[in-house]
Amino acid sequence: MAPKKDKVPPPSSKPAKSGGGKQKKKKWSKGKQKEKVNNMVLFDQATYDKLLTEAPKFKLITPSILSDRMRINGSLARRAIRELMAKGVIRMVAAHSSQQIYTRATNT
């Protein structure tokens, strides 16, 4: 019979532990700040014309989408939607206390 070899544990990739050393302190990350948007509070003629021509072509119309695309504030966007509804160029899809969804008016 061949002589028995001593079992040696495989070398581990972790370094040997050296006493209860202090862990590296976590750094605080710099919080990302959103850029302030300077939206209009009143319509100028160019923006109003753009609203009347482009908004009825949107597939989905909400106050937040109008506010984003037209650079107008939320209350102005709600007023604009109310006016487009009165003219009959958009129709309501769903209404909730905090979110109203509209779409372009089709023949149906």
From Swiss-Prot:
GO molecular-function terms, A-Z: mRNA binding; structural constituent of ribosome
Source organism, top-level taxon: Eukaryota
Alphabetical UniProt keywords: Ribonucleoprotein, Ribosomal protein
One Gene Ontology term, aspect cellular component: cytosolic ribosome
DNA damage as UniProt keyword: no
Ranges where the record places region Disordered: 1-36
Transmembrane segments: none
InterPro entries per UniProt: Ribosomal_eS25 (IPR004977)
Keyword hit for Transcription: no
Compositionally biased intervals (Basic residues): 22-31
Entry similarity comment: Belongs to the eukaryotic ribosomal protein eS25 family.
Protein name, as recorded: Small ribosomal subunit protein eS25w
Source organism (scientific name): Arabidopsis thaliana (Mouse-ear cress)
Gene that this polypeptide is encoded by: RPS25E
